[in-house]
A protein has these predicted regions:
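Nucleotide-activated chemistry modules centered on ATP-dependent adenylation/adenylyltransferase
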Residues: 1-240
């Protein structure tokens, strides 16, 4: 049985990858994520979310492995970064496979480079949602009961009115209409935060959202949130 460390951001794609891996029979051993500190936005084009990743891990009943980037960190140093994640995941939770939430790989053979880098570190690498386009991913969230907040939009591609709203049937209809009009919205044009999931033993409630902008993205930073526990036992979903 595979013991998986999910490369996790708290968004819909990494969460769907986790659910897909678990449904295939894998054991989800931990979540792994980089924390870029003061340079996080420069590195990852997003706000840092270590507390949210840790909150998700608690609701899932698995450990969170948060790797702080050092002064020599480089986003494009793929082999080194994959090796860092693999080593940390192996030590923290005994994982042997990384799970990536990359969807509709837009970088040619980049996923093959990820797999080769993982193999050099003695790991497998699975990308269970790589064939998902944005419309399918949103539809799957709705079908599974995954609630996700839209926390970022590419200003030139996605109408700003969706910022701060949850993925829903109306947003799905908007994506379909854009596609029919020849203005396809890609997964990279959207950032989300999962609030509730069938795998969570509760939910995340944002309390303070602060608007901002990074490059061409309009973003909402979750400055305050709380976790509400439900009746489900954390980890009950993880039967691999």
């Amino acid at each position: 049985m595979k013991k998986c460390a999910v490369i996790y951001s708290g968004g819909k794609d990494s969460h769907l990858a986790l659910l897909e891996a678990a449904s295939s029979g894998a054991k989800i051993a931990c979540l792994v994520s980089f924390d870029g500190g003061a340079g996080h936005a420069e590195y990852f084009n997003d706000y840092r979310k270590p507390e949210l990743v840790a909150a998700h891990a608690g609701l899932l009943g698995v450990p969170a492995v948060i790797l702080k980037t050092g002064p020599d960190f480089r986003v494009k140093a793929l082999a080194r970064n994959v090796a860092l994640m693999a080593r940390a995941a192996r030590e923290a939770c005994g994982a042997d496979t990384l799970v990536s939430g990359v969807a509709r790989c837009r970088c040619g053979g980049k996923i093959d480079s990820w797999r080769k880098a993982a193999a050099r570190a003695g790991f497998g690498l699975d990308a269970p949602v790589i064939g998902f386009d944005l419309i399918y991913a949103v539809r799957l969230c709705l079908e599974l009961g995954v609630r996700a907040l839209i926390t970022g939009v590419e200003a030139k591609k996605v109408d700003r009115r969706w910022l701060g709203r949850e993925l829903d049937g109306e947003f799905l209809a908007y994506l379909s209409a854009e596609k029919k009009a020849g203005r396809t919205v890609d997964g990279s044009d959207l950032q989300t935060l999962v609030l509730e999931s069938p795998a969570f033993a509760g939910r995340v409630i944002p309390l303070k959202l602060v608007p901002g902008r990074i490059a061409g993205q309009e973003l909402l930073k979750v400055e305050k949130f709380r976790v509400v526990r439900g009746r489900r036992r954390a980890g009950a979903w993880n039967r691999g």
